[in-house]
Amino acid sequence: MKITVIGAGAIGGNLAVKLSAAGHDVQVADARGPEAVRAEVLESGARAVELADAVQGRDVIVLSIPFGVAGQLADLFASVPDETVVIDTSNYYPGML
């Protein structure tokens, strides 16, 4: 499967590593840019991409970002086809809202 993980932190990075090891075509995007993706994630075979390029042509998109910033991605998802699976692993932090 073609999978994008948005968020290169502990959860997103580990998911990218495991999904790559399982043979999936994985790309990772982070709001801080491709350079924010940790070396061990890239060594797994996942590719770092710009956030603007992260959602096109993918079967699955995994959100691994803080809960409070998910709404900032609305424009990014405007052109995502209805059949694309979106999985949200976002974290809620007390005091975030």
Task: Give, region by region, the residue ranges found by the protein language model.
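NAD(P)+-binding Rossmann beta1-loop-alpha1 motif at the extreme N-terminus of oxidoreductases
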Residues: 1-43
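Rossmann-like NAD(P)-binding element
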Residues: 45, 49-87, 91-96
